């Protein structure tokens, strides 16, 4: 069945989005909602200053499938992204939606690897942020020197640089190194987060990027860093797990995500088309 490449949808406020009256054949209500959430993540990434022209990517699994995901068309800026512009593809590399654009090859390698192997990773985000890349180049990686870092470190894993991610055999090593983590520092390259929802994925990237920014800024000052005692490090790591686990007040980033959607509705409302 052929799928048209565009959708007409009237934008609605956050939390009240409905399936548009005219919709692309073959797109379910659940997929359309996923498209809106993912397009929002792209717009917010641009708004945060985390985009790298056309060089990075965010994806989410198509609801109800194990082998299909949505990702950006290679050629659109993040600030231009809309729900209908996103490309649906499968983990075998086939485009399942009509688009004049292709998928970034490195994006396919990275995102297909995680969507194939981590069924609880519905959303995946990869960035080349200023501070994330800076920490990724440092041998010691993310240090336990701030509260933000300590509430994230339980989720952080590392993957060694292998060149531009065009080789599909790197997928196995990416998956191995991510393990059960939620944040991956790609050494000499960038950062990656996964989440059960787009909101959780985005909230994790926010925490990781802030922790990296604080570390680089503190080191730039040249003064000796204040070492946190080991027992306080352990205590704060436990607190971070409790706060961001299911049932914790920061679980899933749901409150942050709802607030960010309201901000996006005010400042860049075209994403839900």
Q: How would you label these PLM feature ranges?
A:
Residues 2-273:
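Glycine-rich flexible loops
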